Amino acid sequence: MTFVDSCVLIDIFNDDAQWKSWSIDQVSRALPRGLCINAVVYAEVSSSFATQHDVTTAIKHGRLDIKDIPMEAAYLAAEAFKRYRLNKGQFKTALPDFFIGAHAQVLSCPLLTRDPQRFATYFPDVQLITPTAAG
């Protein structure tokens, strides 16, 4: 199973000129092992669609399994946010990336993303599939 970050799906859904091809290729490579997202990713990609039905249809078409966020992941997200604040992070509430990274860690699955910095810093045990790592 591969956890897919919202930026990768937004590339595809919004026909991003720079990243759509890479994102489609990586999703296609990961598809045989299964793909998943959570409600946070669902919320972030929703702005690309006119209706909830459209979002859900696109998610189903992409064969993405929507996983509930377990309490263990919520706790890990909070712990990551505490470290972020200690590192002088400016945001006052937990960032979506913390819920995404923590969920991938709890599931012990790789995370497909174009934005590896925060994930690598706060979830170093999560294998990242990125433009640099993918080659």
Please annotate each region the language model reported.
Residues 1-37, 47-58, 129, 135:
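Short, well-structured N-terminal submotif of metal-dependent ribonuclease cores
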